[in-house]
A protein has these predicted regions:
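N-terminal intrinsically disordered/low-complexity leader segments
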Residues: 1-9, 154, 206
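Helix-turn-helix
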Residues: 2, 13, 17-55, 59
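Hydrophobic alpha-helical connector segments
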Residues: 59, 73-105, 158-169
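Short, basic, alpha-helical segments at the C-terminal edge of helix-turn-helix-like DNA-binding modules
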Residues: 62-68
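Amphipathic alpha-helical segments used for helix-helix packing
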Residues: 86, 100-123
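Amphipathic C-terminal alpha-helical segment
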Residues: 97-100, 118, 144, 169-187, ...
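Hydrophobic alpha-helical segments that form the core
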Residues: 105, 110, 154-179, 195-198
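Hydrophobic alpha-helical bundle segments that form small-molecule/ligand-binding pockets
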Residues: 119-121, 125, 131-162, 202-206
Length: 206
């Protein structure tokens, strides 16, 4: 019997269906049978698209970062305004996504990061690649802000390179998002925004 050729649309459909399930209950909390039932794909066909649940989890993360980095590019490079304004727009979008009603906009890194890094090296590597893609984009926007004069960092930050500042900001927002999830309170995210403006040398009305 001939093998069934993988169909990209079906593969993407499985990933799309799995995303909200994983956001809700995590990787280990969602069974393969549940994903297949939601996607209406038979178990036998699943293995034409993913060799294992681990490979499936890696593919979910890669699909998430592809979409997320595209949105990040739109906010940090394609949006109008100065580089400083684009940076604040990016973090405004982050804050809105973590406090709004759309559960599917939540950060998959916050949900899965600590859980899967000890379970799967391939998923940990996918997370590392994706998060590096984010901090690289933030660093480029910080460099653009220094070039266009819209970012004037305070004295304590002037010696830091753009990549170091980008990583510090990303760490701050990841931690704030996790704390907001634990406390069900946005105070940590509002504090992250204040800290971001301070680190970048921006006034509250930028």
């Amino acid at each position: 019997m001939n093998a069934i050729a993988p169909t990209p649309d079906v593969r993407q459909h499985i990933l799309d269906v799995a995303h909200p399930l994983l956001l809700q209950r995590g990787f280990t909390g969602v069974g393969l049978a549940e994903v297949l039932a939601a996607a209406k794909v038979p178990k036998g066909s699943f293995y034409h698209y993913f060799g294992s649940k681990e490979a499936f989890g890696e593919a979910v993360l890669e699909a998430y970062f592809t979409e997320y980095l595209g949105r990040t590019d739109a906010l940090l490079t394609e949006a109008p305004g100065t580089a400083a304004q684009r940076l604040i727009g990016y973090f405004d979008d982050w804050l809105d996504s973590q406090t709004g009603d759309d559960a599917q906009s939540r950060c998959l890194v916050v949900k899965l990061g600590a859980e899967v890094c000890d379970l799967s090296e391939s998923m940990r590597a996918a997370l590392a690649r994706g998060t590096r893609g984010i901090t690289d984009r933030l660093a480029r926007c910080i460099e653009a802000g220094r070039a266009d004069g819209s970012l004037q960092p305070p004295p304590q930050a002037k010696e830091q390179d753009a990549q170091g500042i980008a990583v510090a900001l990303y760490q701050r927002w990841l931690g704030a998002s996790l704390l907001a999830k634990i406390t069900r309170d946005r105070a940590s995210l509002d504090m992250a925004m204040r800290d971001t403006r301070q680190l970048l040398g921006l006034s509250p009305d930028t």
